[in-house]
């Protein structure tokens, strides 16, 4: 965004409408947008801007197509799993994601197929919403589109924190399809840890220094014990076949696939995120990360 850009923040709650350097509007989103549209009547972006935007969109589409591709022999990734489901699901199926790396990966790589079909909990990193929220979404979806599926993308970390509504979904006959992507812990926080110059510590199960013998969870058996159908796949090609079986199932279906904790993250489309880094450190890597991070502030609009 240009340094002189202004952001209009719309929210029904006064506290949440007021954001840093924004122009807040307290009110209903639809009514506010209608009013703003009238105020913008006659506005048209310049030809130069439209051409730039269209060119960037073409570049982005090409990047996503390559990012979700399963034809090359690379490690399993979130993006590949997202691409597989996106290509097979019905346009009225609803997807749910929350917490960890999946909200950003879904936002970047999912091509929305229809209105009101994407539910990504982003603001509070609400671990566990993936399954509990999906169950609630399926209850709502059943009112008008009972034949369509609710699909949850869930990491192993969030799954272990809150999974009991798998049982609830089976008990209440509200079928979910859960894509459980196992990266061995909390890999996106491990990535953040590494990106700020730190060594991996206590985010991946394999990096817990107090654990003598780390072990994998049998997610397939666990989901089955709560009444769900479940299977484990080795790669995106097997995931596609399993997803077809999940679509045909009459009850909650969990598909487990390991993904690489280090490779395959979406590298484009990121926004700047202010993360505290120490000004003084014994580690050169941490200090260098702090210096590099400070350099990225040049486009920050502090407002104070």
How does the language model describe each region?
Residues 48-52, 98-99, 258:
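Short coil/turn segments at secondary-structure boundaries
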Residues 53-61, 260-262, 271:
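A short, charged, Gly/Pro-tolerant segment at domain boundaries
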Residues 2, 90, 248:
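Short conserved AdoMet
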């Amino acid at each position: 965004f240009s340094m002189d850009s202004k952001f209009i923040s719309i929210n029904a709650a006064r506290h949440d409408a007021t954001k840093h350097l924004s122009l807040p509007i307290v009110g209903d989103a639809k009514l506010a947008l209608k009013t703003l549209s009238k105020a913008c009547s006659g506005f048209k972006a310049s030809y130069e801007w439209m051409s730039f935007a269209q060119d960037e969109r073409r570049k982005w589409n090409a990047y996503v197509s390559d990012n979700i591709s399963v034809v090359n022999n690379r490690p399993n990734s979130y993006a590949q799993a997202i691409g597989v489901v996106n290509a097979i699901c019905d346009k009225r199926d609803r997807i749910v994601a929350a917490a960890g790396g999946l909200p950003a990966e879904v936002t970047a790589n999912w091509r929305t197929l229809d209105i009101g079909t994407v539910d990504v909990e982003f603001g509070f990193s609400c671990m566990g919403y993936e399954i509990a929220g999906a169950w609630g979404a399926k209850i709502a979806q059943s009112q008008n589109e009972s034949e369509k599926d609710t699909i949850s993308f869930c990491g192993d970390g969030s799954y272990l924190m809150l999974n009991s509504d798998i049982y609830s979904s089976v008990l209440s006959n509200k079928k979910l399809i859960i894509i459980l992507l196992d990266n061995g812990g909390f890999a996106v926080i491990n990535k953040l840890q590494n990106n700020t110059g730190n060594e991996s510590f206590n985010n991946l199960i394999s990096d817990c220094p107090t654990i003598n013998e780390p072990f994998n969870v049998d997610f397939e058996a666990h989901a089955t014990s709560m009444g769900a159908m479940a299977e484990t796949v080795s790669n995106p090609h097997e995931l596609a076949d399993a997803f077809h079986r999940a679509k045909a199932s009459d009850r909650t279906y969990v598909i487990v696939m390991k993904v690489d904790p280090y490779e395959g993250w979406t590298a484009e489309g990121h926004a700047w995120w202010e993360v505290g880094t120490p000004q003084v450190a014994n580690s050169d890597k941490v200090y260098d990360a702090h210096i590099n991070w400070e350099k990225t502030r040049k486009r920050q609009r502090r407002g104070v």
